[in-house]
């Protein structure tokens, strides 16, 4: 659920359209991209709610088959149980590439912060 303060402070003032859904299966056919995250135990006020909800939003191959053929699945990793390992073999599973891209971005950011020069040419090392 989108927290009320985000709805009131951000979504409504900017007239950003959104809708909340309960069923992953009902939503998958309409999505262009699926960004999965784990159900975060530390965000729940009580253990009972976490236990009741933690297994509802699990993506497996059966559910993924409901999605568009070109819909990428993203996830920040590491995962817990929210994406079945069988999904890893599906060409839409883009989370490993996502992690690799993130690694390269961090490397480029660090390199640009170091402001290095090439010892042979004396020129600044460019990040591109």
What function would you assign to each model-found segment?
Residues 25-29, 61, 111:
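Amphipathic, non-transmembrane alpha-helical secondary structure
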Residues 70-71, 76-128:
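Adenosine-phosphate binding glycine-rich loop
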Residues 32, 38-40, 77-78:
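Short glycine-/small-residue-rich Rossmann-like dinucleotide-binding loops
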Residues 1-36:
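Glycine-rich phosphate/diphosphate-binding loop of Rossmann-like nucleotide-binding domains
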Residues 62-70:
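Short, conserved loop/helix-junction motifs that constitute active-site signature segments
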Residues 13, 44-49, 88-92:
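Short glycine/proline- and charge-enriched loop/turn segments
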């Amino acid at each position: 659920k989108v927290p009320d303060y985000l709805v009131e402070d951000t979504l409504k003032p900017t007239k950003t359209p959104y809708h909340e859904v309960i069923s992953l299966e009902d939503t998958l056919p309409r999505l262009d991209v699926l960004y999965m995250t784990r159900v975060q135990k530390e965000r729940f006020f009580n253990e009972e709610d976490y236990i009741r909800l933690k297994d509802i939003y699990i993506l497996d191959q059966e559910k993924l088959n409901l999605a568009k053929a070109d819909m990428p699945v993203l996830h920040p990793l590491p995962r817990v149980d929210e994406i079945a390992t069988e999904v890893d073999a599906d060409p839409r599973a883009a989370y490993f590439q996502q992690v690799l891209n993130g690694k390269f971005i961090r490397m480029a950011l660090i390199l640009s912060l170091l402001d290095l020069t090439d010892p042979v040419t004396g020129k600044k090392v460019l990040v591109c």
